[in-house]
């Protein structure tokens, strides 16, 4: 995660802290500009450069370049629309890990010391942001099974078993 953020910062000219804090934040003004086809579209078409794009688009494009560079070698990329960015590659294992809300709250309470209410609020906000980010940049639905090769319920399997299953699937896919 940190390495990808730092590489994207170098690529975009933005600070690592800015990217880390804003990579999944899609503002309503960005969504409005996206719908209206305002100035950033000129940058996407190569007519105005990336500086005419909203910062969120600059961050996404910088991360996209870094993800594509990393994917030239064996690697693990968590999130960041990597399944979409690498959709043309055939040697990619696309995994979605999920758990019930009850299991996720339990984990957040245990790992971060949150109250159950705070855990629910943080998870709901995070899920909403991820879904909005994913839909904005991919036009796909976050968590849609059609976008993944493997989906695992870490709540019922446990984190270690899910990790072992992913490793096994990746090894089998290499054969």
Where are these regions (language model features)?
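Small-molecule kinase domains that catalyze NTP-dependent phosphoryl transfer to phosphate-bearing small molecules
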Residues: 24-39, 115-160
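A common structural junction motif
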Residues: 170-175
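ATP-dependent small-molecule kinase phosphotransfer cores
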Residues: 7-74
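RNA pseudouridine synthases
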Residues: 70, 75, 81-89
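A short beta-strand-loop structural module common to alpha/beta enzyme folds
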Residues: 1-5
């Amino acid at each position: 995660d940190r390495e990808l953020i730092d590489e994207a910062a170098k690529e975009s000219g933005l600070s690592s802290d800015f990217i880390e804090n804003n990579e999944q934040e899609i503002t309503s003004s960005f969504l409005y500009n996206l719908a209206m086809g305002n100035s950033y579209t000129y940058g996407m078409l190569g007519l105005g450069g990336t500086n005419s794009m909203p910062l969120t688009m600059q961050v996404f494009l910088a991360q996209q370049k870094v993800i594509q560079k990393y994917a030239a070698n064996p690697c693990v990329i968590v999130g960041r629309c990597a399944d979409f960015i690498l959709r043309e590659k055939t040697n990619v294992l696309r995994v979605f890990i999920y758990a019930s809300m009850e299991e996720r709250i339990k984990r957040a309470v245990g790992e971060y010391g949150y109250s159950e209410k705070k855990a629910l609020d943080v998870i709901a906000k995070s899920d909403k942001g991820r879904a909005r980010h994913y839909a904005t940049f991919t036009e796909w639905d976050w968590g849609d099974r059609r976008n993944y090769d493997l989906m695992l319920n870490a709540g019922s399997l446990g984190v270690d078993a899910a990790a072992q299953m992913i490793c096994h699937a990746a090894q089998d896919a290499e054969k």
